[in-house]
Regions:
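Short acidic helix/loop segment immediately C-terminal to the autophosphorylated histidine
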Residues: 12-19
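Short alpha-helical segment of the dimerization/phosphotransfer core of two-component systems
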Residues: 31-36
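Conserved E/DxxT/N motif and adjacent residues on the DHp alpha2 helix
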Residues: 37-55
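Short flexible loop/turn segments at helix-to-beta-strand junctions
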Residues: 51-61, 66, 96
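Conserved catalytic submotifs in the C-terminal HATPase_c
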Residues: 57-62, 83-93, 129
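Short conserved segments within the C-terminal catalytic ATPase subdomain
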Residues: 77-86, 118
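Conserved glycine-/histidine-rich ATP-lid loop and adjacent helix of the Bergerat-fold HATPase_c
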Residues: 160-169
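Glycine-rich ATP-binding loops of the HATPase_c
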Residues: 169-175
Length: 193
């Protein structure tokens, strides 16, 4: 917030700044204001979750269809910077989840932040453990695990994701340093056949 206010004051009060500098400062103000807004919104979302004010829908959903849609969405918004491969032997699997929240979860794991200009090779590995009755998702190369400790907004997003998954009886684990690369693993209890 101090950066945004400081640059804004500099722009409005300084008559000595060149027009190019004012444009550059304007871009910095815009970027920092957007980051601040995302941070505040993430905090508010986490606060609603922790206070119990957010209620999830518990509905039967075909998870493979949700994953295919999530991968396709990420490819579209990734502007050619994302190579995503779905690695699974599951054709169809029902789980109990909130479809909108599950889509948001996938988006957070597959789509890099707007200011992240890196390219990513992501593998979405999905397996069903019949003995345990759980579906395991392993998102290898996820931008969210790469930037795990880079900013507070990312930490809050991990907390939001974990809260959602725990509400449905699953686990959520972030590993930023593995031989496969940064990854997130989460599990989901299976429902139906």
């Amino acid at each position: 917030m101090n950066v945004v206010v400081g640059f804004a004051e500099l722009l409005t009060e300084s008559k000595e700044l060149a027009p190019e500098a004012k444009v550059e400062y304007g871009k910095m103000i815009q970027e920092n204001a957007e980051n601040l807004l995302k941070y505040v919104n993430s905090i508010l979302e986490l606060s609603r979750l922790e206070s119990g004010k957010t209620k999830y829908k518990h509905e039967g959903c075909e998870v493979m269809s949700l994953c295919r849609k999530g991968v396709e969405f990420a490819r579209q918004v990734g502007n050619g910077r994302l190579a995503i491969r779905l690695d699974t032997n599951i054709q169809s699997q029902m789980i109990c989840t909130d479809e909108n929240w599950f889509s948001t979860l996938l988006s957070s794991l597959l789509v890099p932040a707007e200011n992240d200009k890196n390219s990513y090779n992501i593998v979405v590995r999905i397996r069903y453990d019949k003995e345990k009755g759980i579906v395991t998702f392993k998102i290898i190369g996820t931008p969210l695990a790469k930037s795990r400790f880079e900013n507070k907004t990312t930490l809050i997003r991990h907390e939001i994701n974990a809260h959602f998954i725990h509400a449905f009886g699953g686990i959520y684990k972030v590993q930023s340093d593995t031989h496969e690369g940064p990854l997130v693993i989460f599990t989901w209890p299976k429902t139906g056949d």
